[in-house]
């Protein structure tokens, strides 16, 4: 797994260093299961989603408890190279010998991953906890010896392989409530989380944790895998059901039941976490030889009223928080629209292959807002972008909150506008080339393609409709651009010297009062030095 994927999890494991207690289930003897050939703990117990919701509800009625504990010294001291040296033995994968389409392998504790999770297999409605076994791992040059490790050490998480290529992951659950998946390019990128709490606020963010997992044994020849998870944190307990179908676009149906322990100021449903260092539109820290560095380049939204919105991402000098009010949103996501290798020139991590992730609500979510948090970062090892849905009403203790949504991971999204979409945003100094500038202005060039743009006749007048929260717009245009079979909209923005904070911009293309494109939103901060002459 890529270095940055682990570092992003380290941020989510701010509460690391504790073990969660294993719930009492009667006998805890270790046996080897005759079907999976893996060691199990205790007796099989009845399991279904209704039971899991009941357990989460009961937990929420009790005070949150986290028992302190320490990893074995040698495990806690593992550095990056040592942790990477720990391999999983393929012959110990869950269902390795069962001729099913899925196999599951487990992550070892260590490095950033210091909290053990309990993992169960569900077969015919009965769940049995899988036991940690040093024989599952090849410790290589890690410096660890399996015989020296506690028999109840536990796992950090798990990853799933599919029969089309059992050497590569389709999804992984690792760290707090983080999980990720690939599409047809078999490339990890951005992550999702089970829940976000108080993200982007002045006080520390709370990171709920998936403390238990139940993985349902799939039917023979089934391409669907069902995973259940129990979420816990000081503010909330929750039950999750994931129905995972891999493919060119990997789909995950997610059902969520939340039971707050206390009032939650900022609840994030369907949270997405990504990285944006710099790109065509924002080159504040573009000091690398590569032209662009990002996992995602924009936030896409399909509002309840049917409007399509594209908000390019930025790497601001200071944390930015934006909320886009909506009622029953149809979808939102962090997308990687730019898929041209030449724009990245990275043949190691292949940013041009990073999946987009679209959140599709399965029922009405009511009033609230899609919220975007952009955090300054100096390099690509830190995930600095978060997007999620925030309900208008704050969750209260004693409530049951139910949400259902589908996650789509891949290069192509399940729905796209029938209008033209933004394919690039570029910015630079304004004014007229060759003429002396007498005041500071900033130019914006937005390229649109798709929809009906390529079909427009030469006499059709296309206009950019532009609005700004501060300053004035000048030198506006919208002209055909044959290279993209679309149009380029351009304008200069002049802002008064006393405007210091961000300026909100909005633009779309129209003809005869009819929209031709999605709506482009942008937030730009004027530089402190505007002494261009």
At which residue positions do the language-model features occur?
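Solvent-exposed N-terminal domain segments of exported/luminal and surface proteins
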Residues: 62-201
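Terminal accessory/anchoring regions of large secretory-pathway or extracellular enzymes
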Residues: 30-80, 87-89, 107, 343-533
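A contiguous, surface-exposed recognition patch within enzymatic or periplasmic domains that forms
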Residues: 81, 184, 265, 269, ...
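Acidic, contiguous internal or C-terminal segments within carbohydrate-active enzymes
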Residues: 229-278
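N-terminal export signals
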Residues: 5-27
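Extended, loop-rich substrate-binding clefts of extracytoplasmic carbohydrate-active enzymes
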Residues: 189-247, 363-378, 382
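A mature extracytoplasmic/lumenal domain signature
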Residues: 123, 134, 229-233, 246, ...
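Beta-strand cores of secreted/periplasmic/IMS beta-sandwich domains, seen most often
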Residues: 116-123, 250-260, 404-407
């Amino acid at each position: 797994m890529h270095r940055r994927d682990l570092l992003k999890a380290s941020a989510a494991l701010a509460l690391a260093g504790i073990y969660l207690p294993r719930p009492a289930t009667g006998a805890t003897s270790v046996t080897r299961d005759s079907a999976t050939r893996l060691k199990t703990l205790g007796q099989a117990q009845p399991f279904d989603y209704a039971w899991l919701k009941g357990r989460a509800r009961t937990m929420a009625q009790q005070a949150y408890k986290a028992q302190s504990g320490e990893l074995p010294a040698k495990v806690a001291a593992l550095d990056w190279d040592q942790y990477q040296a720990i391999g999983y033995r393929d012959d110990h994968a869950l269902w390795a010998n069962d001729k099913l389409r899925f196999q599951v392998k487990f992550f070892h504790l260590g490095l950033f991953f210091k909290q053990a999770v309990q993992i169960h297999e569900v077969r015919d409605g009965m769940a049995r906890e899988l036991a940690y076994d040093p024989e599952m791992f090849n410790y290589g040059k890690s410096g660890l010896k399996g015989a020296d490790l506690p028999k109840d050490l536990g796992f950090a998480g798990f990853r799933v392989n599919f029969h089309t290529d059992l050497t590569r992951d389709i999804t992984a659950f690792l760290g707090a409530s983080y999980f990720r998946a690939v599409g047809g390019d078999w490339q990890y990128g951005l992550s999702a989380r089970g829940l976000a709490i108080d993200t982007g606020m002045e006080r520390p963010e709370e990171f709920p944790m998936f403390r238990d997992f139940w993985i349902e044994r799939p039917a023979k020849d089934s391409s669907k895998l069902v995973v259940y998870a129990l979420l816990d944190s000081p503010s909330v307990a929750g039950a999750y059901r994931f129905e995972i179908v891999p493919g060119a676009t990997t789909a995950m149906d997610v059902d969520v039941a939340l039971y707050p322990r206390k009032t939650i100021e900022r609840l994030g449903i369907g949270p997405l976490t990504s990285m944006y260092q710099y790109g065509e539109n924002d080159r504040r820290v573009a000091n690398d030889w590569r032209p662009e560095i990002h996992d995602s380049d924009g936030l896409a939204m399909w509002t309840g009223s049917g409007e399509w919105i594209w908000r390019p991402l930025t790497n601001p000098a200071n944390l930015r928080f934006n909320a886009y009010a909506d009622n029953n949103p149809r979808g939102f996501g962090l997308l990687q629209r730019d898929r041209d290798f030449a724009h990245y020139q990275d043949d190691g991590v292949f940013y041009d292959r990073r999946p987009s992730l679209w959140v599709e609500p399965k029922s009405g979510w009511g009033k609230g807002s899609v919220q975007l948090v952009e955090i300054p970062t100096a390099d690509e090892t830190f995930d600095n972008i978060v997007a999620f849905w925030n309900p208008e009403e704050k969750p209260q203790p004693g409530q049951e909150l139910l949400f259902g949504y589908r996650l789509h991971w891949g290069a192509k999204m399940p729905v796209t506008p029938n209008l033209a979409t933004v394919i690039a945003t570029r910015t630079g100094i304004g004014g007229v080339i060759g003429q002396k500038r007498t005041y500071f202005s900033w130019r914006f060039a937005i390229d649109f393609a798709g929809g009906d743009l390529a079909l427009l006749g030469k006499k059709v007048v296309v206009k950019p409709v532009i609005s700004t929260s501060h300053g004035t717009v000048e030198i506006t245009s919208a002209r055909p651009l044959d290279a993209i079979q679309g149009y380029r909209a351009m304008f200069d923005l002049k802002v008064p010297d006393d405007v210091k904070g961000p300026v909100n911009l909005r633009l779309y293309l129209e003809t005869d009062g009819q929209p031709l494109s999605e709506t482009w939103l942008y937030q730009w901060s004027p530089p402190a030095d505007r002494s261009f002459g």
